[in-house]
Amino acid sequence: MKILIVDDDPAIRLLLFTVFGEEHDVSVLCDGHNAVSVLSDPNHQFDVVLLDLKMPRLSGEMVLEFLSGWQNIKTKFIIISGFHDEARHFKYPNLVATLAKPFNIKELVRIVETSHQSAAASGA
């Protein structure tokens, strides 16, 4: 599975890379602006994006807003944020979960694996 981590906190980026890096192809970015640049490439092939909500330059919500109008996006998004209550109300087609910081690692791994399996089962 190919995972993109987008978070402005270096400790969170390192933690998530450590959790997923051994078994998956993981890339790490520090802001939403870079995420939009990478995800705008139709050949990016990321299965799952772990996305912080509040970041400098471009927020996670703006990343989702920007990409929501695109057709045929198969990438699944999971928001991990200290602003979980705000994110729970988002209605973006590829947003599969929101987790509050601090989060449970086992729960996150389960959500990532489940979102990838359901996408694969549906042919996405």
What label would you give each PLM region?
Residues 10-28:
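Two-component/phosphorelay signaling modules centered on CheY-like receiver
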Residues 75-81:
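Hydrophobic/aromatic residues positioned on beta-strands within the core alpha/beta folds
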Residues 52:
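Active-site residues of response regulator receiver
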Residues 37, 61-73:
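Short amphipathic alpha-helix used as the core "switch/output" element in two-component signaling
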Residues 55:
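Receiver (REC) domain active-site loop signature in two-component systems and cognate sites
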Residues 28-37, 60:
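Helix N-cap/capping motif at the beta->alpha junctions
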Residues 103-114:
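C-terminal output helix
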Residues 1-10, 16-17, 49:
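Conserved acidic segment of CheY-like receiver
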